[in-house]
Amino acid sequence: MTTIGLKRIYEAPSPNDGYRVLVDRVWPRGMTKEKADIDLWAKDIAPTDNLRKWFCHDPAKWNDFQIKYREELEGNKPALEDLIATAKARGGRLTLLYGAKDEEHNQAVVLHEFMQTL
């Protein structure tokens, strides 16, 4: 079984993070690759540029964003299943990393919920 967690990329890495995957399409501001200490930058599972720009972290668009992003994720299940399998092979812990300040209204929250159903 794989445990999936969420964490802002600006928080210090921990050995308990397991397989650390950045799920933003754009690299987080001010973050160096060394400091990020990620195992994978999964741009392909992040929201498309059009969806990301439309949402613009506006909580008023949150419900519609969730629906639209889940539709994108439906077409990307093989990549998500590969992530879970890799995390399982590396000890069973996957941490989805994101750069957004809003910890409740961001793509990683939607992705986390979606991956729980796989």
Regions found by a protein language model. Name each.
Residues 1-118:
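Residues lining hydrophobic/aromatic ligand-binding pockets adjacent to catalytic sites
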